[in-house]
């Protein structure tokens, strides 16, 4: 099996967590009784929390690297794999991720390595993270600048997640993560863009970035950019701020009402 370095892929998945925030919302902000609740926002963002940990572990296997943040047993102890020139099929048996969740199940990985672009597709089949079951595909298109000063990851998802209580969340769409490396952590910038749909509890949420969500790697949250979350005809804009390294964002409802939230 041809091996290539996907360590930067792990960094990209860490940026996903920057989108997670806690809402201090109040009912009635939209003027017609329709709002976007904290629970709904958590549902929209929850798919990346689950799939990201698994993807990071796969990146470690493919790259042949080690990372203290991810603990994966050696082949034969934790997983078995059959390799080809273009990928592998791996079956996991109680592998430990980040010291918490056991992963079990099968993933089929195929990839194509180019001089400037690497395409990697992971297909999950009854893949468990703890008691949460993942099915579907995630395709990663990974590129870097010729000067190696930045790296970009486009993630195309078509997947379903069955929670421990039996509820199902599905997601499809594309997200792009870009990391521009600086001389320091403060000077390294992370950008997120894309559009995707999430279906849960009978509702469909359409998410689209209007202005790329950006922030310094030294900040805990994204600090600029806007995205729109649409549900049942209600479109709420989330504004991440003016560049200050804080934990504040603003919800903007169609009638002009605004609401400040803590990230």
Show the residue positions of the predicted features:
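Low-complexity, intrinsically disordered segments exposed to solvent
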Residues: 25-263
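C-terminal motif of bacterial Sec signal peptides marking the signal peptidase cleavage site
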Residues: 19-23
């Amino acid at each position: 099996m041809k091996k290539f370095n996907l360590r930067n892929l792990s960094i990209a998945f860490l940026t996903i967590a920057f989108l997670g925030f806690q809402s201090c919302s109040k009912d009635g902000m939209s003027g017609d009784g329709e709002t976007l609740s904290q629970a709904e926002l958590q549902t929209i963002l929850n798919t990346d929390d689950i799939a990201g940990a698994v993807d990071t572990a796969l990146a470690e296997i493919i790259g042949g690297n080690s990372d203290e943040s991810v603990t994966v047993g050696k082949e034969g102890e934790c997983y078995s794999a059959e390799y080809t020139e273009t990928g592998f099929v791996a079956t996991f048996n109680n592998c430990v991720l980040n010291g918490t969740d056991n992963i079990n199940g099968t993933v089929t990985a195929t990839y194509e390595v180019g001089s400037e672009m690497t395409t990697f597709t992971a297909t999950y089949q009854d893949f468990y993270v703890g008691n949460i079951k993942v099915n579907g595909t995630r395709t990663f298109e990974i590129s870097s600048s010729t000067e190696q000063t930045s790296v970009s990851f486009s993630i195309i998802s078509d997947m379903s997640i069955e929670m421990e209580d039996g509820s199902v969340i599905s997601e499809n769409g594309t997200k792009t993560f870009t990391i521009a490396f600086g001389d320091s952590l403060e000077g390294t910038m992370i950008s997120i863009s894309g559009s995707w749909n999430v279906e849960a509890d009978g509702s469909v949420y359409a998410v689209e970035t209007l202005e790329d969500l950006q922030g310094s790697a030294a900040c805990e949250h994204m600090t600029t950019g806007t995205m729109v979350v649409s549900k049942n005809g209600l479109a709420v804009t989330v504004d991440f701020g003016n560049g200050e390294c804080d934990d504040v964002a603003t919800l903007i409802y169609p009638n002009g009402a605004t609401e400040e939230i803590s990230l």
